[in-house]
């Protein structure tokens, strides 16, 4: 065996040992970083739980999921605007560190509400069940539940999904045991009474008019180069029905259309909805609530194609900005526009009717002004929160 081969082989072994050492060192460093992160997360959660115990907030409201949807906007508005001491369960800070499921699996049972506490549940069975357990342990606790939207067949493509069945079961069998039950819409109040004999108080979903008034059409135009368009805010979800908006864009090539929504792409429309997005349709991604307000301000009208809504926040935001709106003839949207007094509606599935109503909508200068007044009187959070606070005080 030559000397050069021995030298080469020795060098190869040395290099492999170095690489192995580097690999194990990186794993060691990664584990240290992970352990440090876990330590600080545990410390953060412990401090948060300690603060709840020490401060004893009057109202524990949940379940917060920290997602840009109507239910989360609703709970955050209560926290921000209520004159009472409100604590979101879990807090935004906690949800930025651990998952929703992690919190309810490992931490929710560490919260021990006092006898004078008020538990206010919304939508999510994890929190509804926890509220029920706390109420069973301590009957002096006051439990309020808000019904936002029951799950109907329109929420799925075919049979109900298992989680939708679980949510509905929780609404009917568990949330119905709350001391006070609220419905965010009149149509839903009737539905729960007639279908399940559940009595609810009507306190409408609110809209943050102050935030709506901060909308800036110029900002949106400078950012995206778009203005004077017909707007839809949606997502890839059967109940949101984005396909009909694309069909409307196809039917009105002389107008520009914008659709905003997480996961919406030309490829998605082609592959899942079997439809081609026309050239006069701009597809934008997910946006924050204030960015959506800017989009509404830059638009000439909003079109909502939803198959089902509780009481749609988006439609109320559009009305708050005095922007024309056309909605599908589903109960929640119809209630928002007072069955045509403050907006236009079309027959779901009828694109020709949708086109007719959209053309009427963009010419109307009267209904949008009245629509804002309707929002200010009934749906402005500054009005709604007083009704919620009165329930907290009873």
Model features per residue range: what roles?
Residues 366-378:
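A short, well-ordered alpha-helix in the C-terminal region of glycosyltransferases
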Residues 339-340, 344-351, 359-365:
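Conserved acidic donor-binding segment of nucleotide-sugar-dependent glycosyltransferases
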Residues 206-222:
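Acidic anion/phosphate-binding donor-loop and adjacent secondary structure
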Residues 60, 221-240, 246-252, 258:
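Conserved donor-binding/catalytic core segment of Leloir-type glycosyltransferases
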Residues 307:
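Aromatic "clamp/platform" in nucleotide-sugar-dependent glycosyltransferases that forms part
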Residues 162-180:
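Membrane-proximal helix-turn-helix segments that form the acceptor-binding/catalytic region
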Residues 270-290:
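Nucleotide-activated donor-binding/catalytic signature segment of Leloir-type glycosyltransferases, i.e.
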Residues 324-327:
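Short hydrophobic beta-strand element within catalytic cores of glycosyltransferases
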């Amino acid at each position: 065996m030559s000397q050069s081969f021995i030298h080469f082989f020795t060098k190869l072994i040395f290099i492999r040992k170095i690489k192995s050492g580097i690999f194990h060192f990186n794993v060691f460093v990664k584990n240290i970083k992970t352990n440090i992160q876990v330590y600080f997360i545990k410390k953060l959660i412990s401090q948060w739980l300690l603060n709840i115990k020490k401060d004893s907030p009057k109202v524990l409201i949940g379940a917060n999921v920290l997602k840009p949807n109507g239910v989360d906007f609703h709970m955050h508005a209560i926290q921000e605007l209520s004159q009472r001491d409100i604590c979101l369960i879990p807090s935004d800070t906690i949800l930025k560190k651990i998952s929703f499921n992690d919190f309810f699996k490992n931490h929710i049972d560490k919260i021990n509400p006092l006898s004078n506490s008020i538990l206010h549940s919304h939508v999510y069975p994890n929190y509804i069940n926890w509220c029920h357990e706390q109420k069973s342990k301590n009957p002096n606790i006051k439990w309020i539940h808000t019904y936002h939207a029951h799950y109907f067949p329109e929420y799925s493509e075919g049979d109900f999904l298992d989680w939708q069945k679980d949510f509905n079961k929780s609404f009917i069998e568990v949330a119905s045991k709350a001391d006070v039950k609220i419905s965010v819409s009149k149509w839903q109040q009737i539905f729960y009474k007639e279908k399940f004999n559940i009595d609810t108080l009507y306190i409408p979903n609110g809209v943050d008019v102050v935030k709506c008034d901060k909308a800036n059409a110029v900002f949106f135009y400078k950012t995206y180069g778009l203005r004077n368009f017909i707007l839809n805010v949606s997502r890839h979800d059967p109940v949101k029905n984005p396909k009909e908006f694309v069909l409307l864009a196809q039917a009105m090539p002389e107008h520009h259309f914008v659709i905003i929504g997480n996961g919406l792409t030309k490829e998605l429309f082609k592959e899942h909805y079997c439809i081609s997005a026309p050239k006069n349709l701009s597809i934008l991604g997910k946006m924050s609530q204030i960015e959506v307000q800017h989009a509404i301000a830059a638009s000439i009208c909003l079109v909502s194609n939803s198959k089902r809504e509780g009481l749609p926040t988006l439609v109320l935001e559009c009305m708050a900005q005095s922007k024309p709106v056309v909605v599908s003839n589903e109960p929640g949207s119809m209630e928002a526009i007072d069955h045509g007094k403050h907006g236009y509606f079309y027959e779901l599935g009828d694109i020709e009717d949708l086109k007719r109503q959209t053309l009427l909508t963009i010419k109307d200068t009267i209904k949008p002004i009245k629509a804002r007044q309707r929002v200010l009187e009934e749906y402005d959070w500054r009005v709604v929160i007083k009704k919620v606070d009165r329930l907290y005080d009873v």
